[in-house]
Amino acid sequence: MNRIIKKAKTLKGEITPPPDKSISHRAVMFASLAKGQSRIKNFLWAKDPLSSLNAMKSLGVEITITDSKEIIVNGKGLHSLKESDNVIDCGNSGTTIRLLSGIVAGQRFLTVLTGDDSLRYRPMKRIINPLSLMGANIMGRAENKFPPIVIKGGFLKGISYEMPIASAQVKSAILLAGLYAKGETTLTEPHKSRDHTEKMLKNMGVNIIINDNTVKLSPVDHELNCFDITIPNDFSSAAFFIAGACLVPDSEILIKQVNLNETRTGFIEVLKNMGATIEIFNITEQGGEPVGDIFAKSSSELKGINVQGDIIPKLIDEFPILCVVATQAEGKTVIKDAKDLRAKESDRIKAMTSELKKMGVKIKEFEDGVEIEGPCKLIGTEVYSYKDHRIAMALSIAGVIAEGETTIKDANCVDISFPEFYSLLEMLQK
Protein backbone atom coordinates (compact mmCIF):
# COMPACT_ATOMS: atom_id res chain seq x y z
CA MET A 1 0.00 0.00 0.00
CA ASN A 2 1.26 3.47 -0.92
CA ARG A 3 0.47 6.59 1.10
CA ILE A 4 0.33 10.17 -0.20
CA ILE A 5 1.57 12.82 2.24
CA LYS A 6 0.84 16.52 1.74
CA LYS A 7 2.61 19.49 3.24
CA ALA A 8 1.16 20.39 6.65
CA LYS A 9 0.31 23.96 7.65
CA THR A 10 0.53 23.01 11.31
CA LEU A 11 0.52 20.02 13.67
CA LYS A 12 -1.48 20.61 16.85
CA GLY A 13 -3.02 18.39 19.45
CA GLU A 14 -2.57 15.76 22.13
CA ILE A 15 -1.69 12.14 21.36
CA THR A 16 -0.98 8.92 23.21
CA PRO A 17 1.65 6.86 21.38
CA PRO A 18 1.36 3.06 21.23
CA PRO A 19 2.66 0.83 24.05
CA ASP A 20 6.39 0.19 24.22
CA LYS A 21 7.44 -2.44 21.69
CA SER A 22 10.62 -3.54 23.50
CA ILE A 23 8.81 -4.05 26.81
CA SER A 24 5.83 -5.79 25.14
CA HIS A 25 8.19 -8.42 23.71
CA ARG A 26 9.94 -8.94 27.02
CA ALA A 27 6.80 -8.98 29.15
CA VAL A 28 5.20 -11.89 27.30
CA MET A 29 8.49 -13.83 27.02
CA PHE A 30 9.61 -13.36 30.62
CA ALA A 31 6.14 -14.09 32.04
CA SER A 32 6.32 -17.40 30.16
CA LEU A 33 9.45 -18.32 32.15
CA ALA A 34 8.02 -17.32 35.55
CA LYS A 35 6.18 -19.54 38.01
CA GLY A 36 2.58 -18.40 38.39
CA GLN A 37 0.10 -16.12 36.70
CA SER A 38 1.31 -12.83 35.20
CA ARG A 39 -1.01 -10.12 33.89
CA ILE A 40 0.05 -7.72 31.13
CA LYS A 41 -1.89 -4.52 30.42
CA ASN A 42 -1.32 -2.03 27.58
CA PHE A 43 0.41 -4.61 25.34
CA LEU A 44 1.36 -3.43 21.84
CA TRP A 45 -1.04 -5.17 19.46
CA ALA A 46 1.27 -4.91 16.45
CA LYS A 47 2.95 -7.50 14.26
CA ASP A 48 6.34 -7.62 16.01
CA PRO A 49 5.21 -8.27 19.62
CA LEU A 50 2.56 -10.70 18.35
CA SER A 51 5.42 -12.73 16.85
CA SER A 52 6.81 -13.13 20.38
CA LEU A 53 3.40 -13.97 21.85
CA ASN A 54 2.74 -16.64 19.22
CA ALA A 55 6.26 -18.04 19.60
CA MET A 56 5.72 -18.63 23.32
CA LYS A 57 2.40 -20.32 22.56
CA SER A 58 4.28 -22.58 20.14
CA LEU A 59 6.51 -23.62 23.05
CA GLY A 60 3.51 -24.75 25.09
CA VAL A 61 2.87 -21.65 27.20
CA GLU A 62 -0.75 -21.08 28.24
CA ILE A 63 -1.66 -17.52 27.23
CA THR A 64 -5.17 -16.08 27.28
CA ILE A 65 -6.46 -12.68 26.17
CA THR A 66 -9.39 -11.11 28.02
CA ASP A 67 -12.18 -9.05 26.45
CA SER A 68 -10.40 -5.92 27.72
CA LYS A 69 -7.22 -6.95 25.85
CA GLU A 70 -5.35 -7.88 29.02
CA ILE A 71 -2.94 -10.79 28.55
CA ILE A 72 -2.84 -13.52 31.20
CA VAL A 73 0.23 -15.78 31.09
CA ASN A 74 0.14 -18.94 33.19
CA GLY A 75 3.85 -19.57 33.60
CA LYS A 76 4.94 -23.00 34.76
CA GLY A 77 8.58 -22.11 35.43
CA LEU A 78 11.99 -21.94 33.75
CA HIS A 79 12.02 -25.59 32.69
CA SER A 80 8.39 -25.91 31.58
CA LEU A 81 8.70 -25.10 27.87
CA LYS A 82 7.91 -27.85 25.37
CA GLU A 83 9.41 -28.60 21.98
CA SER A 84 7.42 -27.01 19.15
CA ASP A 85 6.08 -29.45 16.55
CA ASN A 86 6.78 -26.91 13.81
CA VAL A 87 9.27 -24.25 12.73
CA ILE A 88 8.68 -21.04 14.72
CA ASP A 89 8.06 -18.04 12.46
CA CYS A 90 9.41 -14.83 14.03
CA GLY A 91 7.98 -12.64 11.26
CA ASN A 92 9.92 -9.39 10.87
CA SER A 93 11.06 -9.30 14.48
CA GLY A 94 14.77 -9.31 15.30
CA THR A 95 13.87 -9.04 18.99
CA THR A 96 11.79 -12.23 18.82
CA ILE A 97 14.39 -14.36 17.07
CA ARG A 98 17.35 -13.17 19.15
CA LEU A 99 15.75 -13.26 22.60
CA LEU A 100 14.03 -16.55 21.83
CA SER A 101 17.39 -18.01 20.80
CA GLY A 102 18.73 -17.25 24.27
CA ILE A 103 15.71 -18.88 25.90
CA VAL A 104 15.70 -22.09 23.84
CA ALA A 105 19.50 -22.43 24.14
CA GLY A 106 18.79 -23.62 27.68
CA GLN A 107 16.08 -26.13 26.72
CA ARG A 108 16.87 -29.79 26.13
CA PHE A 109 15.04 -29.98 22.83
CA LEU A 110 15.33 -28.87 19.21
CA THR A 111 14.03 -25.51 17.97
CA VAL A 112 14.05 -24.08 14.45
CA LEU A 113 13.55 -20.31 14.08
CA THR A 114 12.91 -18.42 10.85
CA GLY A 115 11.28 -15.19 9.67
CA ASP A 116 10.18 -13.12 6.72
CA ASP A 117 12.27 -12.07 3.71
CA SER A 118 13.90 -9.26 5.69
CA LEU A 119 14.60 -11.21 8.89
CA ARG A 120 16.22 -14.06 6.97
CA TYR A 121 19.01 -11.62 6.05
CA ARG A 122 19.55 -10.14 9.52
CA PRO A 123 22.94 -11.07 11.06
CA MET A 124 22.80 -13.93 13.57
CA LYS A 125 26.49 -14.67 14.12
CA ARG A 126 26.41 -12.06 16.89
CA ILE A 127 24.20 -14.39 18.98
CA ILE A 128 25.36 -17.74 17.58
CA ASN A 129 28.97 -17.15 18.69
CA PRO A 130 28.32 -16.39 22.41
CA LEU A 131 25.54 -18.98 22.75
CA SER A 132 27.87 -21.60 21.26
CA LEU A 133 30.55 -20.60 23.78
CA MET A 134 27.97 -21.25 26.52
CA GLY A 135 27.45 -24.80 25.23
CA ALA A 136 24.42 -24.55 22.94
CA ASN A 137 24.48 -26.48 19.68
CA ILE A 138 23.35 -23.77 17.27
CA MET A 139 23.65 -23.36 13.51
CA GLY A 140 22.46 -20.81 10.97
CA ARG A 141 22.19 -20.55 7.22
CA ALA A 142 25.16 -19.41 5.09
CA GLU A 143 27.86 -20.44 7.59
CA ASN A 144 25.94 -19.18 10.62
CA LYS A 145 25.29 -15.73 9.16
CA PHE A 146 21.51 -15.77 8.72
CA PRO A 147 18.23 -17.47 9.69
CA PRO A 148 16.76 -20.01 9.66
CA ILE A 149 18.66 -21.09 12.75
CA VAL A 150 18.55 -24.50 14.40
CA ILE A 151 19.16 -24.74 18.15
CA LYS A 152 19.65 -27.89 20.21
CA GLY A 153 19.77 -26.61 23.75
CA GLY A 154 21.27 -28.33 26.72
CA PHE A 155 23.69 -27.88 29.59
CA LEU A 156 25.03 -24.32 29.49
CA LYS A 157 27.91 -22.70 31.34
CA GLY A 158 28.29 -19.04 32.22
CA ILE A 159 30.80 -17.00 30.23
CA SER A 160 32.61 -13.68 30.43
CA TYR A 161 31.98 -12.00 27.08
CA GLU A 162 33.12 -8.74 25.50
CA MET A 163 30.43 -7.69 23.05
CA PRO A 164 31.86 -6.24 19.80
CA ILE A 165 28.84 -3.92 19.42
CA ALA A 166 26.34 -2.39 21.83
CA SER A 167 23.12 -4.34 21.26
CA ALA A 168 20.25 -4.84 23.68
CA GLN A 169 19.04 -7.84 21.66
CA VAL A 170 22.39 -9.63 21.84
CA LYS A 171 22.85 -8.72 25.51
CA SER A 172 19.36 -10.02 26.29
CA ALA A 173 19.90 -13.29 24.42
CA ILE A 174 23.03 -14.02 26.46
CA LEU A 175 21.41 -13.03 29.78
CA LEU A 176 18.39 -15.23 29.08
CA ALA A 177 20.68 -18.16 28.30
CA GLY A 178 22.51 -17.27 31.53
CA LEU A 179 19.33 -18.09 33.48
CA TYR A 180 19.96 -21.74 32.53
CA ALA A 181 23.75 -21.69 32.89
CA LYS A 182 26.01 -23.09 35.56
CA GLY A 183 28.22 -20.29 36.86
CA GLU A 184 28.21 -16.55 36.44
CA THR A 185 27.50 -14.79 33.13
CA THR A 186 29.28 -11.46 32.61
CA LEU A 187 28.83 -9.12 29.63
CA THR A 188 30.63 -5.92 28.72
CA GLU A 189 29.39 -3.60 25.97
CA PRO A 190 31.43 -0.85 24.25
CA HIS A 191 28.53 1.54 25.00
CA LYS A 192 25.51 0.97 27.22
CA SER A 193 22.41 -0.20 25.31
CA ARG A 194 18.80 -0.15 26.53
CA ASP A 195 18.37 -1.95 29.85
CA HIS A 196 14.76 -3.20 29.96
CA THR A 197 15.88 -6.84 30.24
CA GLU A 198 18.07 -6.15 33.27
CA LYS A 199 15.34 -4.16 35.04
CA MET A 200 12.63 -6.74 34.42
CA LEU A 201 14.75 -9.76 35.41
CA LYS A 202 15.83 -7.96 38.61
CA ASN A 203 12.17 -7.41 39.50
CA MET A 204 11.57 -11.14 38.91
CA GLY A 205 14.17 -12.04 41.54
CA VAL A 206 17.27 -12.55 39.39
CA ASN A 207 20.58 -11.44 40.93
CA ILE A 208 21.95 -8.94 38.40
CA ILE A 209 24.72 -6.43 39.12
CA ILE A 210 25.25 -3.51 36.71
CA ASN A 211 28.50 -1.54 36.73
CA ASP A 212 28.76 1.02 33.91
CA ASN A 213 28.73 -1.04 30.69
CA THR A 214 29.15 -4.40 32.44
CA VAL A 215 26.29 -6.67 33.50
CA LYS A 216 26.83 -9.67 35.78
CA LEU A 217 24.13 -12.36 36.20
CA SER A 218 24.45 -14.93 38.98
CA PRO A 219 23.22 -18.52 38.57
CA VAL A 220 19.50 -18.92 39.20
CA ASP A 221 18.60 -21.59 41.78
CA HIS A 222 14.91 -20.70 42.17
CA GLU A 223 11.88 -20.04 40.00
CA LEU A 224 11.30 -16.52 38.67
CA ASN A 225 8.57 -14.38 40.24
CA CYS A 226 5.42 -13.80 38.20
CA PHE A 227 4.34 -10.18 37.82
CA ASP A 228 1.63 -7.71 36.85
CA ILE A 229 2.70 -4.94 34.48
CA THR A 230 1.11 -1.98 32.73
CA ILE A 231 3.43 -1.29 29.82
CA PRO A 232 4.39 2.39 29.33
CA ASN A 233 4.07 4.07 25.93
CA ASP A 234 6.83 3.86 23.36
CA PHE A 235 9.40 6.66 23.14
CA SER A 236 10.59 5.54 19.71
CA SER A 237 7.06 5.96 18.34
CA ALA A 238 6.69 9.33 20.08
CA ALA A 239 9.93 10.54 18.45
CA PHE A 240 8.28 11.01 15.04
CA PHE A 241 5.76 13.45 16.49
CA ILE A 242 8.37 15.23 18.61
CA ALA A 243 10.24 15.86 15.36
CA GLY A 244 7.07 16.85 13.51
CA ALA A 245 6.24 19.46 16.14
CA CYS A 246 9.76 20.91 15.94
CA LEU A 247 9.78 21.10 12.12
CA VAL A 248 6.28 22.21 11.08
CA PRO A 249 5.56 25.94 11.65
CA ASP A 250 3.12 26.99 14.39
CA SER A 251 2.99 23.46 15.83
CA GLU A 252 2.41 22.25 19.39
CA ILE A 253 2.04 18.58 20.35
CA LEU A 254 1.54 17.06 23.80
CA ILE A 255 2.53 13.38 23.92
CA LYS A 256 1.16 11.50 26.93
CA GLN A 257 2.66 8.90 29.28
CA VAL A 258 5.87 8.16 27.37
CA ASN A 259 8.61 5.80 28.59
CA LEU A 260 11.55 8.02 29.62
CA ASN A 261 14.12 5.30 30.33
CA GLU A 262 17.49 7.09 30.13
CA THR A 263 18.89 4.43 27.78
CA ARG A 264 16.18 5.38 25.24
CA THR A 265 15.93 9.18 25.27
CA GLY A 266 19.13 10.30 23.54
CA PHE A 267 16.99 11.78 20.75
CA ILE A 268 15.60 14.46 23.09
CA GLU A 269 19.11 15.30 24.32
CA VAL A 270 20.33 15.74 20.74
CA LEU A 271 17.31 17.81 19.64
CA LYS A 272 17.73 20.14 22.63
CA ASN A 273 21.40 20.58 21.72
CA MET A 274 20.25 21.50 18.21
CA GLY A 275 17.98 24.21 19.67
CA ALA A 276 14.62 22.44 19.85
CA THR A 277 11.95 23.45 22.37
CA ILE A 278 10.96 20.31 24.28
CA GLU A 279 9.61 20.02 27.84
CA ILE A 280 9.03 16.96 30.02
CA PHE A 281 6.67 16.95 33.01
CA ASN A 282 4.28 14.82 35.10
CA ILE A 283 7.04 12.24 35.65
CA THR A 284 5.89 9.09 37.48
CA GLU A 285 6.74 5.38 37.34
CA GLN A 286 4.94 2.68 35.38
CA GLY A 287 5.99 -0.92 34.80
CA GLY A 288 9.28 -0.23 36.59
CA GLU A 289 10.13 2.58 34.14
CA PRO A 290 10.02 6.39 34.44
CA VAL A 291 7.17 7.83 32.36
CA GLY A 292 6.08 11.38 31.65
CA ASP A 293 4.41 13.76 29.24
CA ILE A 294 6.44 15.40 26.45
CA PHE A 295 5.55 18.81 25.03
CA ALA A 296 7.22 19.85 21.77
CA LYS A 297 6.64 22.92 19.61
CA SER A 298 8.00 24.61 16.51
CA SER A 299 11.69 25.44 16.66
CA SER A 300 12.60 28.35 14.39
CA GLU A 301 16.37 27.98 14.50
CA LEU A 302 17.93 24.52 14.67
CA LYS A 303 21.69 24.15 14.31
CA GLY A 304 23.71 21.20 13.01
CA ILE A 305 25.80 19.22 15.51
CA ASN A 306 27.99 16.11 15.75
CA VAL A 307 26.28 12.98 17.10
CA GLN A 308 28.55 10.03 17.98
CA GLY A 309 29.89 7.78 20.73
CA ASP A 310 27.96 6.78 23.85
CA ILE A 311 24.73 8.49 22.80
CA ILE A 312 24.26 6.40 19.64
CA PRO A 313 22.75 3.31 21.39
CA LYS A 314 20.35 5.69 23.19
CA LEU A 315 18.89 6.85 19.85
CA ILE A 316 19.61 3.91 17.56
CA ASP A 317 15.95 3.58 16.52
CA GLU A 318 15.66 7.34 16.00
CA PHE A 319 18.39 7.60 13.34
CA PRO A 320 15.92 7.89 10.41
CA ILE A 321 13.90 10.69 11.99
CA LEU A 322 17.07 12.43 13.23
CA CYS A 323 18.22 12.57 9.60
CA VAL A 324 14.97 14.35 8.72
CA VAL A 325 15.46 16.88 11.54
CA ALA A 326 19.03 17.50 10.35
CA THR A 327 17.76 18.58 6.91
CA GLN A 328 16.25 21.68 8.56
CA ALA A 329 19.23 22.56 10.78
CA GLU A 330 21.68 25.34 9.92
CA GLY A 331 25.09 23.89 8.99
CA LYS A 332 26.37 20.33 9.03
CA THR A 333 25.01 17.50 11.15
CA VAL A 334 27.33 14.49 11.33
CA ILE A 335 26.09 11.16 12.73
CA LYS A 336 28.79 8.51 13.28
CA ASP A 337 29.47 5.24 15.17
CA ALA A 338 26.16 3.83 13.90
CA LYS A 339 27.36 1.01 11.64
CA ASP A 340 24.89 -1.43 13.19
CA LEU A 341 22.11 0.46 11.39
CA ARG A 342 23.16 -1.35 8.22
CA ALA A 343 21.78 -4.56 9.75
CA LYS A 344 18.33 -3.42 10.86
CA GLU A 345 15.03 -4.12 9.05
CA SER A 346 16.79 -2.39 6.16
CA ASP A 347 20.21 -0.81 5.69
CA ARG A 348 18.97 2.38 7.33
CA ILE A 349 22.08 4.42 6.47
CA LYS A 350 21.78 3.58 2.78
CA ALA A 351 17.98 3.91 2.78
CA MET A 352 17.87 7.40 4.32
CA THR A 353 20.73 8.60 2.11
CA SER A 354 19.02 7.38 -1.04
CA GLU A 355 15.52 8.64 -0.26
CA LEU A 356 16.48 12.04 1.17
CA LYS A 357 18.62 12.70 -1.91
CA LYS A 358 15.46 12.21 -3.99
CA MET A 359 13.86 14.97 -1.91
CA GLY A 360 16.74 17.38 -2.56
CA VAL A 361 18.86 16.89 0.56
CA LYS A 362 22.64 17.35 0.58
CA ILE A 363 23.65 14.12 2.30
CA LYS A 364 26.87 12.08 2.30
CA GLU A 365 26.99 8.44 3.34
CA PHE A 366 29.77 6.94 5.49
CA GLU A 367 30.29 3.34 6.52
CA ASP A 368 29.01 4.20 10.01
CA GLY A 369 26.75 7.19 9.44
CA VAL A 370 25.93 10.29 7.41
CA GLU A 371 26.68 13.98 6.99
CA ILE A 372 23.74 16.29 6.20
CA GLU A 373 24.09 19.94 5.23
CA GLY A 374 21.11 22.15 5.93
CA PRO A 375 18.76 23.77 5.85
CA CYS A 376 17.29 22.15 2.73
CA LYS A 377 14.02 22.89 0.99
CA LEU A 378 12.49 19.43 0.63
CA ILE A 379 10.71 18.52 -2.59
CA GLY A 380 7.84 16.05 -2.54
CA THR A 381 8.44 12.99 -4.71
CA GLU A 382 8.02 9.20 -4.67
CA VAL A 383 10.15 7.54 -2.00
CA TYR A 384 10.50 3.93 -0.88
CA SER A 385 10.08 2.62 2.67
CA TYR A 386 12.22 -0.51 2.09
CA LYS A 387 9.35 -2.17 4.01
CA ASP A 388 10.98 -0.75 7.15
CA HIS A 389 8.50 0.83 9.56
CA ARG A 390 10.90 3.47 10.87
CA ILE A 391 11.98 4.53 7.37
CA ALA A 392 8.31 4.87 6.33
CA MET A 393 7.43 7.04 9.33
CA ALA A 394 10.55 9.22 9.03
CA LEU A 395 9.88 9.87 5.33
CA SER A 396 6.26 10.68 6.17
CA ILE A 397 7.44 13.44 8.54
CA ALA A 398 9.76 14.63 5.74
CA GLY A 399 6.65 14.68 3.56
CA VAL A 400 4.73 17.05 5.85
CA ILE A 401 7.49 19.69 5.48
CA ALA A 402 8.12 19.12 1.73
CA GLU A 403 6.71 21.18 -1.12
CA GLY A 404 4.07 19.27 -3.07
CA GLU A 405 3.05 15.67 -2.53
CA THR A 406 5.25 12.86 -1.23
CA THR A 407 4.29 9.26 -2.02
CA ILE A 408 5.56 6.63 0.43
CA LYS A 409 5.76 3.21 -1.26
CA ASP A 410 4.88 0.19 0.92
CA ALA A 411 3.76 2.47 3.74
CA ASN A 412 1.70 -0.28 5.41
CA CYS A 413 4.91 -1.60 7.01
CA VAL A 414 4.17 0.87 9.85
CA ASP A 415 1.89 -1.89 11.17
CA ILE A 416 5.05 -3.58 12.51
CA SER A 417 5.11 -1.14 15.44
CA PHE A 418 2.60 1.70 15.02
CA PRO A 419 -0.65 0.77 13.20
CA GLU A 420 -2.31 4.10 14.14
CA PHE A 421 0.54 6.30 12.85
CA TYR A 422 -1.21 7.74 9.81
CA SER A 423 -4.54 8.33 11.55
CA LEU A 424 -2.76 10.29 14.30
CA LEU A 425 -0.75 12.28 11.75
CA GLU A 426 -3.97 13.24 9.95
CA MET A 427 -5.69 14.14 13.22
CA LEU A 428 -2.88 16.56 14.15
CA GLN A 429 -3.29 18.41 10.83
CA LYS A 430 -7.01 19.15 11.32
Swiss-Prot record:
GO terms for cellular component: cytoplasm. PROSITE patterns: EPSP_SYNTHASE_1, EPSP_SYNTHASE_2. The keyword Repeat does not apply. It holds the Pfam family EPSP_synthase. Its main location: cytoplasm. One of its GO terms (biological process) is chorismate biosynthetic process. Phosphoenolpyruvate binds at K21, G94, R122, Q169, R348, R390. It is an enzyme of class 2 (transferase). Keywords: Amino-acid biosynthesis, Aromatic amino acid biosynthesis, Cytoplasm, Transferase. Pathway: Metabolic intermediate biosynthesis; chorismate biosynthesis; chorismate from D-erythrose 4-phosphate and phosphoenolpyruvate: step 6/7. 3-phosphoshikimate binds at K21, S22, R26, S167, Q169, D317, K344. InterPro entries: Enolpyruvate_Tfrase_dom (IPR001986), Enolpyruvate_Tfrase_sf (IPR036968), EPSP_synthase (IPR006264), EPSP_synthase_CS (IPR023193), RNA3'P_cycl/enolpyr_Trfase_a/b (IPR013792). It is found in: Cytoplasm. Its EC number is 2.5.1.19. It catalyses: 3-phosphoshikimate + phosphoenolpyruvate = 5-O-(1-carboxyvinyl)-3-phosphoshikimate + phosphate. The active site is at D317 (proton acceptor). The keyword NAD does not apply. Monomer. Catalyzes the transfer of the enolpyruvyl moiety of phosphoenolpyruvate (PEP) to the 5-hydroxyl of shikimate-3-phosphate (S3P) to produce enolpyruvyl shikimate-3-phosphate and inorganic phosphate. Belongs to the EPSP synthase family. This is 3-phosphoshikimate 1-carboxyvinyltransferase. The gene is aroA.
